[in-house]
Amino acid sequence: MAKDFGVQEITDDLQPSFNVAPTDNVAVVLNNGVKQLVAMRWGLVPFWATDPKLASKHINARAETLTLKPAFKDAFKRRRCLVVADGFFEWQKQGATKIPLFIHLEPERPFGFAGLYEIWTPPLGEKLVTCTIITTEPNELVRPIHDRMPVILPKDAEDFWLDSAVEDHMRLLDLLQPYQASDMSAFTVSKLVNSVKNNSPECIQPVSAMGQPPLF
């Protein structure tokens, strides 16, 4: 993973996770003069917050309102990051049933969601470093499944996004587009992912590999 993003320092012990839930730790790349791979809690707590429970409301940030929302506008200017993943889950309605899908790049490889991070310092205790994932309109693959999708940054845009010296906010906003659908794919996975208690490689295996019929 470090090689995929040109990381120079790994500051935390990062363990694989196959079913990430809000408030879990996620792997994040940032650039503070040195490109680092760190762990952050998913769910952004604004620096001005009085209660860290706000994190549950801020797991995602809409690209269209980043410069307007108090929770995100300062982080957008100064604290941009990549949230590392190799796919994400969405649930497709089929009658009264919701079918879990794992959506990934084709061929499968790690990528970075466009993210923001914050450092929250309570009156007492240790600082809390949290992040959010930016969403945008869905592409042709995701549109039948959900009305939003996370922003996946192309490789050639990652360094520009991470550069805190960049002040051209319009160019930054222009990066927050749906990823090319032809370079993505999806497959049905087990309903194990419906419970955050389940966090094993089986969560991201195609159901056909587990002896179940595929959806498509």
Question: Where do the PLM segments sit?
Answer:
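Short linear sequence motif anchored by a di-proline
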Residues: 1-216
